[in-house]
From Swiss-Prot:
Chief site of localization: mitochondrion
Originating species: Genetta maculata
Protein's job: Component of the ubiquinol-cytochrome c reductase complex (complex III or cytochrome b-c1 complex) that is part of the mitochondrial respiratory chain. The b-c1 complex mediates electron transfer from ubiquinol to cytochrome c. Contributes to the generation of a proton gradient across the mitochondrial membrane that is then used for ATP synthesis.
Protein's name according to its UniProt entry: Cytochrome b
GO molecular function annotation: metal ion binding; ubiquinol-cytochrome-c reductase activity
């Protein structure tokens, strides 16, 4: 008799995705972040659901309802802080996951990669709208500044912004629709993640060497399930350290001041995970140019497969490309730092140089290093 997990229609899908899935025998801890992102998404949906039970999406009561959750709801404070810091963990895992894809050449699975880019945009949109919901000073002004960027679109810009706002400024209509979108988007992300996995399982996973590993596969369970559980424990440890010891470490103190349209905060800045893109936006004096650079800072990932010139898939045996990759990481950290600084000398110049370097690495230096390494192989 066939095992039920191999015969039952539903169990069969789970079996082929998480149990009997043939996986390369040499994938490292960098391959853990996919499952960790799944865990983060589940944590965010569950904590978000409980927060939504007590939250009110009205400009008069939104701030008070968040305070009420923290003070009066049983364990409301921990649910709120798991949700807020869970978003930070989500982005840490996301950046590691994308970085792994760039380093080891996983982008050659173009369908999986493009769905991943779409997922990244959706997650960023969700996080942005979630940041608006507590209706603090940074929520209000962040929403005003970022939505206002759309007015840079020629001809339809102003109408588009007012359509998104639901009026002539960020107000009750904006908050209500942002709450509605923030609630529905995680479920869309779940569906996209399933499609992401579907495309991945068509080709099988990549591995650190970048070489086809069909001759040496092992079952996902128990080898990688146990490895994923270790990753999960470490994620939980870091998240709970954040939540229980310094829950506001990654937040902005201005968001504890209720939103006031008549008083602008001294430094308007988004959450830390958007600072690199915000720095690129600010480094271009022209509004439309800045918006284009902001979108391209993520969209540039879509042309990485087209600019892959090396004969080797992975960077494992390509020292020149490795140097460029770590230069890119350092550049992103620099941009993140600049995004949190005021717009004054020398930060403006550093931001502009870091932005130029960011695009140069992807568009010029990486393809050139691939060609040079191909030549070196012939020596």
């Amino acid at each position: 008799m066939t095992n039920i997990r191999k015969s039952h229609p539903l169990a069969k899908i789970i079996n082929e995705s998480f149990i009997d899935l043939p996986a390369p025998s040499n994938i490292s801890a960098w391959w853990n972040f996919g499952s960790l992102l799944g865990v983060c998404l589940i944590i965010q949906i569950l904590t978000g659901l409980f927060l939504a039970m007590h939250y009110t999406s009205d400009t008069m009561t939104a701030f008070s309802s968040v305070t009420h959750i923290c003070r009066d709801v049983n364990y409301g404070w921990i649910i709120r802080y798991i949700h807020a810091n869970g978003a930070s963990m989500f982005f840490i895992c996301l950046f590691m996951h994308v970085g792994r894809g760039v380093y080891y050449g996983s982008f050659t699975f173009t369908e999986t990669w493009n769905i991943g880019i779409l997922l990244m945009f959706t997650v960023m949109a969700t996080a942005f709208m979630g940041y608006v919901l507590p209706w603090g000073q940074m929520s209000f002004w962040g929403a005003t500044v970022i939505t206002n960027l759309l007015s840079a679109i020629p001809y339809i810009g102003t109408n588009l912004v007012e359509w998104i706002w639901g009026g002539f400024s960020v107000d009750k209509a904006t908050l209500t629709r942002f709450f509605a979108f923030h609630f529905i988007l995680p479920f869309i992300i779940s569906a996209l993640a399933a499609v992401h996995l579907l495309f991945l399982h068509e080709t099988g996973s990549n591995n650190p060497s970048g070489v086809v590993x069909d001759s040496d596969k092992i079952p996902f369970h128990p080898y990688y399930t146990i490895k994923d559980i270790l990753g999960l424990l470490l994620l939980t440890l870091v998240l709970m350290l954040l939540v229980l010891f310094s829950p506001d470490l990654l937040g902005d103190p201005d968001n504890y001041i209720p939103a006031n349209p008549l008083n602008t905060p001294p430094h308007i800045k988004p959450e830390w995970y958007f600072l690199f893109a915000y720095a690129i936006l600010r480094s271009i004096p022209n509004k439309l140019g800045g918006v284009l650079a902001l979108v391209l800072s993520i969209l540039i990932l879509a042309i990485v497969p087209l600019l892959h010139t090396s004969k080797q898939r992975s960077m494992m045996f390509r020292p020149l490309s490795q140097c460029l990759f770590w230069l890119l990481v350092a550049d992103l950290l620099t941009l993140t730092w600049i995004g949190g600084q005021p717009v004054e000398h020398p930060f403006i110049t550093i931001g502009q140089l870091a932005s130029i370097l960011y695009f140069s690495i992807f568009l010029i230096l990486m393809p050139i290093s691939g060609i040079i390494e191909n030549r070196l192989l012939k020596w």
